[in-house]
Amino acid sequence: MTLTRHQIRERAFQMLFALNANPEADHDALYQRVLTDDPNQLVPVPDYLATLVNGVLAHQSELDAQIDQYLSTGWQLKRIAKTDLVILRMAFYEIEHVDDVPNRVAVNEALELAKNFSDDRSRRFINGVLAHTLDDETDTQA
């Protein structure tokens, strides 16, 4: 089974969301659950899926600190819907740690995930946070 990067991001979101709810879950079993409906079939884990999941988990504290910088006054990480937080972590990870993904692509993919797994209000919130990130990056490069 060959997955597009978009499909891999969807699977990564599903895995990270599940791990957020149950950090002790068996990673290998979760990989198989998001990759196939057949419990008897063992599917190889795409490299980019493992990169996203392991990268977000390894850098979670750093990613949360970065996200926290871009929240409006009065907002805290614990107030963010779990779906939105997972999407933001993935986007920040791709922006900061994945060189072959342009930042605008990471933002667009995050918005697509929000469209599929969250609601319109959350999509606008995610867009606002990520827009500030790109604005700051543009200011730094200028």
From Swiss-Prot:
GO cellular component: cytosol
Annotated Gene3D superfamilies: NusB-like (1.10.940.10)
A family per Pfam: NusB
Residue ranges of the TM segments: none
One annotated GO biological process: DNA-templated transcription termination
GO molecular function: RNA binding
Protein function: Involved in transcription antitermination. Required for transcription of ribosomal RNA (rRNA) genes. Binds specifically to the boxA antiterminator sequence of the ribosomal RNA (rrn) operons.
Matching HAMAP family: NusB
Family under the similarity heading: Belongs to the NusB family.
Name under which the protein is recorded: Transcription antitermination protein NusB
